[in-house]
């Protein structure tokens, strides 16, 4: 009948297992020697162990031939071991480098904290001890992963930094309302004469006035003693100073067209 549970299990592919090895396993597992179940010639089991799942606290495997510790047998050891249980493999050195081979098999079998060390017995027979633990989590277990939510990057605002008021950069002269020059005024004083490099049109107007033999006063403030001067040439006498000029209203500046006197040029 198959056993249901054991505090510790010692297996070997040989006919017998030394009591010293059983004592070492009991000490490592923290149990008495009587609580250790021993199985010899494990290769004849066909890679199966007569124990229920997660029913053994610790396992010691004393292997003479590395090929007897196959992947199937390591999977079986992992099945019967409790979560977090220890497995200790003792093997003799050989040309097949059992240290590297067994370590790799244990890692591929899901064991963790795999550590190897050299040891020697009282009869000076050298061996390799490889210790590992079964993971505390169950094979095939799953758990939800929390996806990190990406928020908008936070802008670090330095409260000590002061914002500059744009208005404070303006001077008093900048705030003054600009004074636009009077249209037609060259700003040459009370005489209001055109300047040398006149560009406002005053020089042309003065030239027209000179050709008419009229004063600026007569152009800017025309008056008529007879009352007919402002009506046009049809009503003006032969000696009228405004003869040839367009009609105007007394007291209002006479508007001379741009092509006035063009025929005289």
From Swiss-Prot:
Motif Cx2C motif 1 mapped to chain: 226-229
The UniProt annotation puts the region (Fe-S binding site B) at: 226-240
Any one biological process term the GO annotation gives: iron-sulfur cluster assembly
> Where in this protein would one find the motif Cx2C motif 2, according to its record?
237-240
Location of region: N-terminal SAM-like domain: 1-143
Among InterPro entries, the record links this protein to:
Anamorsin, CIAPIN1, SAM-dependent_MTases_sf
Q: Which Gene Ontology terms of cellular component type are present? A: mitochondrial intermembrane space
Keyword 4Fe-4S found: yes
Domain of life, per UniProt, equals: Eukaryota
Q: Which cofactor does it need?
A: [2Fe-2S] cluster; [4Fe-4S] cluster
Its biological purpose: Component of the cytosolic iron-sulfur (Fe-S) protein assembly (CIA) machinery. Required for the maturation of extramitochondrial Fe-S proteins. Part of an electron transfer chain functioning in an early step of cytosolic Fe-S biogenesis, facilitating the de novo assembly of a [4Fe-4S] cluster on the cytosolic Fe-S scaffold complex. Electrons are transferred from NADPH via a FAD- and FMN-containing diflavin oxidoreductase.
PANTHER family under this entry? ANAMORSIN (PTHR13273:SF14)
Question: Protein name, please?
Answer: Anamorsin homolog 1
């Amino acid at each position: 009948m198959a056993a249901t549970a054991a505090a510790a299990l010692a297996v070997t592919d040989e006919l017998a297992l030394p009591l010293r090895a059983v004592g070492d396993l009991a000490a490592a597992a923290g149990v008495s020697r009587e609580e250790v179940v021993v199985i010899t010639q494990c290769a004849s089991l066909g890679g199966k162990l007569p124990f229920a799942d997660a029913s053994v606290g610790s396992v010691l495997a004393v292997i003479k031939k590395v090929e007897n510790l196959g992947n199937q047998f390591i999977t079986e050891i992992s099945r019967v071991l409790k979560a977090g249980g220890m497995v200790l493999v003792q093997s003799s050195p050989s040309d097949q480098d059992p240290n590297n081979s067994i370590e790799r098999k244990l890692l591929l079998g899901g064991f963790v904290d795999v550590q190897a060390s050299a040891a020697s017995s009282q009869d000076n027979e050298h061996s390799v001890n490889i210790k590992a633990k079964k993971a505390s989590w169950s094979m095939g277990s799953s758990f939800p992963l929390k996806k990190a939510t990406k928020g908008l990057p936070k802008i670090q605002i330095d409260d000590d930094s002061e914002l500059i008021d744009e208005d404070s950069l303006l001077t008093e002269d900048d705030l003054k309302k600009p004074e636009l020059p009077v249209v037609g005024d060259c700003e040459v004083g009370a005489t209001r004469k055109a300047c040398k490099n006149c560009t406002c049109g005053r020089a042309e107007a003065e030239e027209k006035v000179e050709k008419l033999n009229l004063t600026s006063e007569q152009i800017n403030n025309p008056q008529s003693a007879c009352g007919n001067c402002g009506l046009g040439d049809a009503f003006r006498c032969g000696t009228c100073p405004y003869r040839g000029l367009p009609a105007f209203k007394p007291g209002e500046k006479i508007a001379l067209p741009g092509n006035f006197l063009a025929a005289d040029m």
